[in-house]
């Protein structure tokens, strides 16, 4: 019986992997929307429904003031799972109502995998952008510069450029901040030199 189950698993593996990959791609817009919504409406607004103690807002304000400690730059897996869990529960509940919870195992696994991948990408990209560590993302040249410039514009003008891993969401929601904007600390440093020169 075990041998038959293993043989069945092995023969169906290519189909399962194809379905997993398809669902991984299908979930991409939802993950991008979750990133955008979280950054815009939880990290930049007092939202006691989704963040009762305003921990995310306070931590993000500290980060925007220049703190690049791990707790302000990294994406905790716990936070990502808290955001994705309602969708996983809806998916599993839908499978139970349809009568076949196994029909949602692959879509749920793909969405859960996206949660892990997203947490990793956010942390790597964000750490590279803020110079916290030299990692593979800093070495990809033009793509790194694009992501860095997009994100640093957000630090100068916090009313746009909310997409860190998915910056194109800012085009979709009309919050793209273009143009040549210097990071705040450089602008502040130059102002202080000008003030000293005048004194």
What are these regions (language model features)?
Residues 2-23, 93-109:
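Helix-coil boundary and interhelical linker segments in multi-pass alpha-helical membrane proteins
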Residues 10-13, 26-27, 33, 88:
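N-terminal membrane-targeting hydrophobic helices
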Residues 18-28, 46-54:
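Loop-to-helix transition at the N-terminal end of transmembrane alpha-helices
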Residues 33-192:
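Membrane-embedded catalytic scaffold of the fatty acid hydroxylase/desaturase
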Residues 191-199:
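A membrane-cytosol interface segment of integral membrane proteins
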């Amino acid at each position: 019986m075990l041998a038959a189950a293993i043989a069945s698993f092995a023969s169906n593996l290519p189909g399962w992997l194809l379905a997993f990959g398809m669902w991984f791609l299908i979930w991409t817009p939802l993950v991008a929307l979750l990133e955008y919504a979280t950054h815009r409406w939880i990290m930049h607004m007092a939202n006691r429904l989704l963040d009762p103690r305003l921990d995310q807002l306070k931590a993000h304000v500290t980060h925007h003031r220049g703190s690049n400690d791990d707790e302000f730059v990294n994406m905790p897996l716990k936070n990502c799972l808290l955001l994705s869990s309602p969708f996983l529960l809806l998916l599993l509940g839908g499978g139970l109502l349809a009568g076949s919870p196994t029909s949602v195992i692959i879509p749920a696994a793909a969405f859960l995998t996206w949660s892990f991948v997203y947490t990793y990408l956010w942390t790597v990209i964000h750490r590279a952008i803020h110079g916290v560590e030299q990692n593979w993302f800093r070495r990809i040249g033009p793509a790194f510069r694009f992501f860095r410039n997009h994100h640093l514009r957000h630090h100068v003008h916090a009313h746009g450029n909310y997409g860190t891993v998915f910056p194109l969401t800012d085009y979709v929601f009309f919050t793209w901040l273009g143009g040549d904007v210097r990071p705040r600390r450089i602008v502040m440093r130059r102002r202080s030199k000008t003030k000293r020169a005048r004194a």
